[in-house]
Amino acid sequence: VGSEMCIRDSQVTVDRPDYSGRLQILGVHARGKTLAKDVDLDKVARRTPGYTGADLANLLNEAAILAARRELTEVSNDEISDAIERVMAGPEKKDRVMSERRARLVAYHEAGHALVGALMPDYDPVQKISIIPRGNAGGLTFFTPSEERMESGLYSRAYLQNQMAVALGGRVAEEIVYGEDEVTTGASNDLQQVASTARQMITRFGMSDELGPVALGRAQGGMFLGRDIAAERDFSEETAAMIDKEVSELVDVAYKRATKV
């Protein structure tokens, strides 16, 4: 009585499973589900780097639900592929009807991403292209990230430059097919991603030609590739101007590389 008890919450960090771990998890969650003979969990495990155990469980559950809705007696590769797409990008927007012209534009946009990605050296292979609206996206191009890159979290300058070119491939395709005046707002998220990657290359990863191997700004939070974070400025206006200039140059080079493809 009268004593104080302090309870401190502990946080346990669980790493995302590697290929072997994903294969085992898929095997566990496949129990009780009737899979078609040509469904290979080994291939599914290789297509899902970065997935958590919960993601994998959700994937197989979604595939089983899709099979039931389609009045199928077993889960086929089609249901697996559709479930992967759903887990990655959200449910299909069935109420969003696209005109033939819009569908064609989205197809060109996504083909631009895929083509640039396929022709960039040592880039992630294209897994699937879809023009089915999901979430806020009119279409999506899926790449299969390298297992080694995902596990190590290490990305080279060349890879990041390729990534920016691939992200700009959709807008470039629109410009080539429809002309500069008909480029749409569909590349908005792509442009944000490219700008974020370029800025991190300069201010976080020490990949600046002008400033050298330095990290600028005191980050507030963890580092996630492709996601901008808040940072306290600890550099001058002159340095800020140099950063903006280099970011612009990196984006311009990436756009030209995508155009040349």
Region annotations inferred by a language model:
Residues 103-108, 114-261:
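Soluble catalytic regions of large protease machineries
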Residues 55, 112-113:
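Short hydrophobic/aromatic residue motifs in ordered secondary structure
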Residues 1-7:
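Short, small-residue-biased leader/transition segments that mark boundaries at the very start
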Residues 11-81, 90-91, 95, 167-175, ...:
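Conserved C-terminal "switch" segment of AAA+ ATPases
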